[in-house]
């Protein structure tokens, strides 16, 4: 199990990123728009750099919902490979069957 503080920090990043994603996308669009003047683009770059670091989606780490494990994460199930195998073997995940051929 991951430390609770690490999991909570990641959840905080998810919330901040969701709240500021539209503003961040708008600023990036202004920065990449070459039809605007250099001063406008530079002002947008300064605003973007003043935004919180945690508002960037790059800083979010996919973690298992049950254990908080950051590695071996399956996006479809939102859990780690270990928990997926445990719950799948006892039939707790609908539609998941053990493969045999």
Swiss-Prot record:
Belongs to the universal ribosomal protein uS14 family. It comes from the Bacteria. One of its GO terms (biological process) is translation. The keyword Ribonucleoprotein applies. SUPFAM superfamilies: Glucocorticoid receptor-like (DNA-binding domain). Part of the 30S ribosomal subunit. Contacts proteins S3 and S10. InterPro entries: Ribosomal_uS14, Ribosomal_uS14_bac/plastid, Ribosomal_uS14_CS. It comes from Anaplasma phagocytophilum (strain HZ). Gene3D superfamilies: 1.10.287.1480. PROSITE patterns: RIBOSOMAL_S14. This is Small ribosomal subunit protein uS14. Pfam families: Ribosomal_S14. Binds 16S rRNA, required for the assembly of 30S particles and may also be responsible for determining the conformation of the 16S rRNA at the A site. The keyword NAD does not apply. One of its GO terms (cellular component) is small ribosomal subunit. Keywords: Ribonucleoprotein, Ribosomal protein, RNA-binding, rRNA-binding. GO terms for molecular function: rRNA binding; structural constituent of ribosome.
